[in-house]
């Protein structure tokens, strides 16, 4: 039964990631984006445990969990697994800020701490500048100073009851690095016939590689030290195939299937160096994903604060990713047969990411971040 459960979180995250990705792409057409759907799950799961009635049902459905027990088991074990991933730095930090007069429900406080490793702090929201600074300093500290100014002081007031904050930070070195001397400015097709110059890294090496007819794309997996996390790049076969690819990825099974047909082979890999930051208004995005009730005045969030029923006033995500020769820093089937001719030297496959593509950063089998590179 244990394995079934961990599939609950994995499948819940895959579905949630696909849906959130679709919404964020819709809001940022033709742009580079990065998001961490995975880091939105803990606060939603916390709210599920603190809510009743339709609000509770809606949250369980959104994160793909059958019941509260599954949440308690899953998140406790997953946060342990992720904390022990080898070779990379991965930090997940959750915190609940509660208005000054409010007292946290004892059960909720225990679950927050034990299951989500989440701190709780009382704060005077009416002193909005001080409160915002306090929250933002905490976020900055927990994301290696990458995510700044998450909360706008104007969004806080004496009417604010609670603010849920989640931060995720990843830094990993490639198992084998790119040689900086081989990085050079090369053409990148921003559209079918318009190019710009981008710094393009190059490496010949053994990588897991695949092609997918359903996605009409090439895939490559670039491992980080410790081999428990990797970057998967999904490159459309057509230079202007990004929209079609995003459409195909709406079904989370397509990536899963494509990954299953990947195999190790020698590849000439060309990959741009890049840095992306995205701010996402989760209130808008979640509303489009059928999570509405927590934001309404009649939200049934009754088990977070003693004797008070709350609604969520604000939900924001800022995510960041940087990919370079050293590795990554992030704060958010069709088999292909190669026939060898005797006495002919085999040519490595070429994976040339010189037009917009989608990427997935995975740790311990779970997508932690994903996004689009579209300069």
From Swiss-Prot:
Gene3D superfamilies assigned: Alpha-1-antitrypsin, domain 1, Antithrombin, subunit I, domain 2
One Pfam family from the record: Serpin
Known tissue expression: Hemolymph.
Xref: SUPFAM superfamilies: Serpins
Keyword Chloroplast attached: no
Transmembrane parts of this sequence: none
Site (Reactive bond): 340-341
Keywords recorded for this protein, A-Z: Protease inhibitor, Secreted, Serine protease inhibitor
Single GO term (MF): serine-type endopeptidase inhibitor activity
Any further remark recorded for this protein: The N-terminal section (1-336) is identical to the N-terminal section of the silk moth antitrypsin I (17-352).
Domain notes: The reactive center loop (RCL) extends out from the body of the protein and directs binding to the target protease. The protease cleaves the serpin at the reactive site within the RCL, establishing a covalent linkage between the serpin reactive site and the active site of the protease. The resulting inactive serpin-protease complex is highly stable.
Name of this protein: Antichymotrypsin-2
């Amino acid at each position: 039964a244990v394995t079934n459960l961990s599939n609950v979180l994995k499948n819940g995250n895959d579905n949630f990631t696909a849906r959130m990705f679709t919404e964020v792409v819709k809001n940022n057409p033709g742009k580079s984006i990065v998001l961490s759907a995975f880091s939105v799950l803990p606060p939603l799961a916390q709210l599920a445990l603190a809510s009743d009635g339709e609000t509770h049902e809606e949250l369980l459905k959104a994160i793909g969990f059958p019941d509260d027990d599954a949440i308690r088991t899953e998140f406790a074990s997953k946060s342990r697994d992720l904390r022990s991933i080898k070779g990379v730095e991965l930090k997940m930090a959750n915190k609940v800020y509660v208005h000054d007069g409010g007292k946290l429900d004892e059960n909720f406080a225990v679950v927050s701490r034990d299951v989500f490793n989440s701190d709780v702090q009382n704060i005077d929201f009416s002193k909005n500048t001080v409160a915002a600074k306090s929250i933002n300093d905490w976020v900055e500290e927990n994301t290696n100073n990458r995510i700044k100014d998450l909360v706008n002081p104007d969004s806080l007031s004496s009417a604010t009851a609670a603010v849920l904050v989640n931060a995720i930070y990843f830094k990993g070195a490639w198992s084998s690095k790119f040689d900086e001397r081989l990085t050079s400015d090369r053409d990148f097709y921003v559209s079918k016939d318009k190019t710009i110059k981008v710094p393009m890294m190059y490496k010949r090496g053994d990588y897991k590689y695949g092609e997918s007819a359903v996605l009409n794309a090439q895939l490559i997996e670039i491992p980080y030290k410790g081999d428990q996390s990797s970057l998967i790049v999904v490159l459309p076969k057509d230079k202007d195939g990004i929209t079609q690819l995003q459409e195909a990825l709406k079904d989370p099974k397509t990536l899963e299937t494509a990954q299953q047909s990947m195999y190790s082979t020698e590849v000439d890999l060309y990959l741009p160096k890049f840095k992306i930051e995205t701010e996402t208004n989760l209130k808008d995005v979640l509303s489009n994903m059928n999570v509405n009730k927590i934001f309404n005045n009649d939200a049934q969030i009754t088990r977070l604060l003693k004797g008070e029923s709350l609604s969520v006033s604000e939900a924001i995500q800022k995510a960041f990713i940087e990919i370079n020769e050293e590795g990554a820093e992030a704060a958010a089937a069709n088999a292909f047969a190669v026939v060898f001719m005797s006495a002919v030297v085999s040519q490595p496959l070429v994976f040339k990411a010189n037009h917009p593509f989608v990427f997935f950063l995975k740790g311990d089998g779970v997508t932690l971040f994903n996004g689009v590179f579209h300069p």
